[in-house]
């Protein structure tokens, strides 16, 4: 497992405990994460006032929640390690959908599952000038993320997961806008 895929989870679990959470926490995660979190909690002599339910996912597309209010599907991504994206679809009167495609190479097959999504978050680790690095590391460029948004007929595209080599993130937005105009840079606290 890559650390940037889960390092925030132990802090979130601890925060929920400090705030007095009592309701079970369901964690849908890649295989191996339960072992890591359990080891971290044991070594830190940590505990929670609520139950952690781990649902370790295979590397495939599947429905994980389907009730009257929401449908949540996993999306099989293409990264150096097994990695899943997610599609969240509300079933209420005003249907809202959100696609989350984290670490993945350019994967046009995603477009069918993401068809007409309201908001698409897609990683764009590299600019197109470094597309050879994107291919090598199984990540995407801003151009490739924009192509996925365009082909899937997304309403909005949010770009994120930028390589630290880039200082000016507006270059990502400018690259993507040439293909998909309704593009934003992911910023903490921003509402889209």
Label each residue range with its predicted role.
Residues 186-192:
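Binuclear metal-dependent phosphoesterase catalytic core
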Residues 13-16, 41-44, 90:
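Active-site catalytic pocket residues across diverse enzymes, especially alpha/beta-hydrolases
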Residues 1-18:
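Di-metal (Zn2+ and/or Mg2+/Mn2+) metal-binding site signature of metallo-dependent hydrolases
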Residues 44-57:
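A glycine-rich helix N-cap at a beta->alpha junction
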Residues 1-5, 79, 161:
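Histidine-centered divalent metal-coordination motifs
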Residues 22-26, 96-98:
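Short active-site oxyanion
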Residues 58-160, 167-179:
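Metal-dependent phosphodiesterase/nuclease catalytic metal-binding core
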Residues 24-32, 158-159:
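Short internal beta-strands
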């Amino acid at each position: 497992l890559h650390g940037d895929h889960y390092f925030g989870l132990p802090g979130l679990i601890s925060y929920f405990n400090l705030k007095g959470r009592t309701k079970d926490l369901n964690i849908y995660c890649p295989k191996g994460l339960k072992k890591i979190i359990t080891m971290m909690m044991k070594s830190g002599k940590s505990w929670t006032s609520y139950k952690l339910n781990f649902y370790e996912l295979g590397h495939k597309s599947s429905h994980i929640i389907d009730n009257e209010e929401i449908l949540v599907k996993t999306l099989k991504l293409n990264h150096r390690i097994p990695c899943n994206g997610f599609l969240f679809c509300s079933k209420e009167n005003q249907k809202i959908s959100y696609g989350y495609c984290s670490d993945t190479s350019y994967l046009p097959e995603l477009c069918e599952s993401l068809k007409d999504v309201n908001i698409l978050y897609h990683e764009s680790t590299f600019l197109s000038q470094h597309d050879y690095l994107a291919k090598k590391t199984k990540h995407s460029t801003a151009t490739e993320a924009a192509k996925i948004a365009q082909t899937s007929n997304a309403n909005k595209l949010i770009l994120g997961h930028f390589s630290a080599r880039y200082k000016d993130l507006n270059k990502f937005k400018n690259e993507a806008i040439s293909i998909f105009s309704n593009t934003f840079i992911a910023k903490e606290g921003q509402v889209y």
